[in-house]
């Protein structure tokens, strides 16, 4: 084995020279230079500085403006809540541990940080599944004139949290475990060892199949059908021009969210899968650290995409920030842009 396994950790560094120490007790400067840990800390600080205000503003603006409290927006707000969990439960912890170059909070802190990071990522993924299904049902109309209402949104929210908890909570109750990964300053699922005592291999397979592959298959199926339907409707002029435009804008926004999710999480999932299928192989701490920390940026992109591509929300945000006045003079109440009949989201 080219790494060193302990009771509750796996360090990707051979202990032939006797330098490996527990990542819960000693700085890990034998894994990377001090400046590299400082870079990680600076990156986490940036995510906190950007992630908290963006996601908090998303929630606050929605509370302030009743017109934004629509069924589809419930799912988008769900992402903001999950991102705030990641910021406070994960990013602040990782910032502190990066400054010390080891996981100073011990195994319990590792469990909490790993839980919040996994929970946030899974809520984001299952929220995108719900959005994809909503777009498919509304635009493709497999169930005639189905209207995505408040009850459907609540059921969608429940699904995202149930599925996310089914994944993130399992290591806390003995199915797999959370351990420090990469440069040992953040925690995640144990992809590195078989760990028979906690049935680690079965959990990793379960996670990749149920909580990654199946959601992506659903998403790609829904959008494949959706693209075909939108093109067909446009060719046959089955919908009014304003309705088609609104549906296309909302669909484009959600598709961009999906693409952004893939960009952030596929590198991490790919590296994790490689490590899992090549346990004991030689790889350095940076190999897992970069995709792991890159995936954490997912807490920022969804609200940014939403703000940039949703004219109604953008105008409400400017009105809130500017004490009741929109400096662009584009009052949402007077805009003639049509909303989709189901999602009630105005096009950008």
UniProtKB/Swiss-Prot annotation:
Lipid linkage positions (S-palmitoyl cysteine): 322-323
Which residues take part in binding Zn(2+)? 201, 279
Modified-residue entries (Phosphoserine), positions: 334, 338, 343
The portions of this protein that span the membrane are 37-61, 74-99, 112-133, 153-173, 203-227, 253-274, 287-306
Q: What SUPFAM superfamilies does the database record attribute to this sequence?
A: Family A G protein-coupled receptor-like
Q: Which family does it belong to?
A: Belongs to the G-protein coupled receptor 1 family. Opsin subfamily.
Protein name (record): Rhodopsin
Native organism? Tursiops truncatus (Atlantic bottle-nosed dolphin)
The taxonomy runs: Eukaryota, Metazoa, Chordata, Craniata, Vertebrata
